[in-house]
Amino acid sequence: MIKRILAALVGLSLTSLVFAQSPPLFFKEVWTINGAAHAIAPGENVLTSANLELKLYGPSATASDPDKRIWISTPPTNIWTGMTTTPFAATLRDKENYVDLTGTAKVRWITRASGFHAVHPVVKLADGNYYVGEHSDANTSGFLESEFMFATQRWMKLDIERVVTKGTYGPAQDASAWMREPIDLSKVDEVGFADLIPGSGHGAGGYVNVASFEVYGKPVKRH
C-alpha cells in the first residue's frame, strides 16, 4: 500500500514538473477573411493578431494571376494552397520578439490535406537561414488538430525563393540531405509551414489547408 502511494506521489510530481516546464503560448493565429474564399491580394491583411507579420514565399506567393496564388478560405478560416503552381511556404513573425523553440516548445495546429500533399513546419533562424522539418500532417478526412515538438525534428535546409530542400551528400553518397548537426532553435525569427508540392486547382486533388496555428515557446526580445 505504501509503495503504491509513493509511486502515485512520484508520478504526480513528474507530471507537475512537465507542466511547470511547458513553455507559454507565444502566438495563436486563426486568420480572418473578408467575404468569400479568394486569392490573397498583395498587402491584404488576413491576420487576427496585430503583433504578427505574415510572410509568403515561393513564386506562387506573388503571381499576378489570382488563380495561381495562395488563397484564404473557409470554413474554418484557413490558408489554402490548391491554386499554387509551385511549392509554397508561409511564416509568421512577431514584431517584438524572437522565439526560443528549444526544450518542450511545440506547434499545435489544425490542418487538412488532399492527395499526397502534407504540411511541414518551417523556421527562419536569427542568422537568416530557413529550414523545413521532418514532421508532416496529411490527414484527408477533415480538419484535424495535432501537435509536435520542435526539438524532436530532423531538418533540411530550405531554399526559400523556390521552397525546395537543399543539402549535401552524406557518407556513401547518401542523398537524404538532413542537417548533420542540430540547428540552433534558441532564437527563431519566423515560424510557419510549407507545402512542397504544387496545388491541383479547385476541388479535391492536391493541396493543404492550415487553419488555427499556435506556437508555444519563450519570447526573446529583438532589441
Model-derived features: positions:
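Positively charged n-region of N-terminal signal peptides that target proteins for export
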Residues: 1-4
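Intrinsically disordered, low-complexity segments enriched in glycine/proline and serine/threonine
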Residues: 6-7, 32
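Pyridoxal 5′-phosphate
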Residues: 11
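Beta-rich carbohydrate-recognition modules and glycan-binding surfaces
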Residues: 21-223
